[in-house]
Amino acid sequence: MNPNQKIITIGSICMVVGIISLMLQIGNIISVWVSHIIQTWHPNQPEPCNQSINFYTEQAAASVTLAGNSSLCPISGWAIYSKDNSIRIGSKGDVFVIREPFISCSHLECRTFFLTQGALLNDKHSNGTVKDRSPYRTLMSCPVGEAPSPYKSRFESVAWSASACHDGISWLTIGISGPDNGAVAVLKYNGIITDTIKSWRNNILRTQESECACVNGSCFTVMTDGPSNEQASYKIFKIEKGRVVKSVELNAPNYHYEECSCYPDAGEITCVCRDNWHGSNRPWVSFNQNLEYQIGYICSGVFGDSPRPNDGTGSCGPVSLNGAYGVKGFSFKYGNGVWIGRTKSTSSRSGFEMIWDPNGWTETDSSFSLKQDIIAITDWSGYSGSFIQHPELTGLNCMRPCFWVELIRGRPKEKTIWTSGSSISFCGVNSDTVGWSWPDGAELPFTIDK
């Protein structure tokens, strides 16, 4: 084939391809035009669609109302439930600087709540975190037993004092923040702000640093406003779906209530608190769902606060010897008897033990029948508080009593630039238990401290 024939052949092929392409384009235009005409003439006729659309619906977990009408379970001792080892892990991992951890349970899970300092362990921002109240403190939570890291934790509220509890439907959180002379408690229900409570004495409004207590859809908390070393003002709040529906101020002259540990028992609420003014035994307040209340002090000569005198003769009023200052704590009332949790040291926040005094709620002697070791006196402890596992969680027909212990490390007792803590928890059982020591165990100082 000579060059002219090649040119003619290639040109013919290109012309044929062009004609075919033109015909296809014309056909496509006609098809679109016909489709448009059909849609115009039949506007209500459904158009078939072969697209596959996936719909994602979040399945809400079944909710119940936590009745709180059961009595405390009979127990003979305490089984270890959790230990987060957060200070040990935080020497190399990303762990929040925290204090005031506490545990609360819904009908599905238990969570550790804690007040962060807006800083991580072994980091420059941990410097000076011995301070209680700052605008950087937040309430966060994580699954019980896990170290409070940024990757496993959930933000709850901006707060330097807090409480939280679950009514069977949603979490209620109470976070107090703001200046000492005008702080405000922000109430959230299911993560949404629902109410606020303004400081009524303008003197460091503060709350429990442990779980509130829920009965039949209502949740109850105790707040303090006023001096930490003399008469202050104390209020009980009844909260439903995050809104305050009733409150009452306690008529409690010569009493001092701070950082109450509250739990439901047979449809009523019992709170055991800290007297920072003049009592080395613990004050209590119990009330029904209408906020009709009774007040007193644990009578036992086995004293529950720290600092405190050696055990001796108790009082159903404040025991003033070594009564100033104190530490958050708890007890569980069983009729006339009481389980008392306390530091082993009478003068510092070290060691921890549980003591059963079979008549200690009402009698003043110092005899007791059981003692279980939790932390050795040579190791640091700190705050402690109660929490309850409802029958809806455990499947029992009673309220399981539990407690947590904060294990404070760092300042002011150790040579670090920071203050933080880990936590352990125990639950009451009516079977075999063991006493031992479960300390924090971190080796200090950290790199940032050197």
UniProtKB/Swiss-Prot annotation:
Keyword Calcium: yes
Catalytic activity: Hydrolysis of alpha-(2->3)-, alpha-(2->6)-, alpha-(2->8)- glycosidic linkages of terminal sialic acid residues in oligosaccharides, glycoproteins, glycolipids, colominic acid and synthetic substrates
InterPro entries: Glyco_hydro_34, Sialidase_Influenza_A/B, Sialidase_sf
UniProt keyword list: Calcium, Disulfide bond, Glycoprotein, Glycosidase, Host cell membrane, Host membrane, Hydrolase, Membrane, Metal-binding, Signal-anchor, Transmembrane, Transmembrane helix, Virion
Disulfides per UniProt: 73-398, 105-110, 165-212, 214-219, 260-273, 262-271, 299-316, 402-427
Residues annotated as the enzyme's active site: 132 (proton donor/acceptor), 383 (nucleophile)
Residues exposed to the Intravirion side: 1-6
Glycosylation sites: 50, 69, 127, 216
Enzyme class: hydrolase
Documented EC number(s): 3.2.1.18
CDD domains xref list: Influenza_NA
Residues in the signal sequence: none
Binding-site list for substrate: 99, 133, 258-259, 274, 349
Activity regulation (record text): Inhibited by the neuraminidase inhibitors zanamivir (Relenza) and oseltamivir (Tamiflu). These drugs interfere with the release of progeny virus from infected cells and are effective against all influenza strains. Resistance to neuraminidase inhibitors is quite rare.
Subcellular location: Virion membrane; Host apical cell membrane
UniProt remark on domains: Intact N-terminus is essential for virion morphogenesis. Possesses two apical sorting signals, one in the ectodomain, which is likely to be a glycan, and the other in the transmembrane domain. The transmembrane domain also plays a role in lipid raft association.
The name this protein goes by in its record: Neuraminidase
Taxonomic path: Viruses, Riboviria, Orthornavirae, Negarnaviricota, Polyploviricotina
Gene that encodes it: NA
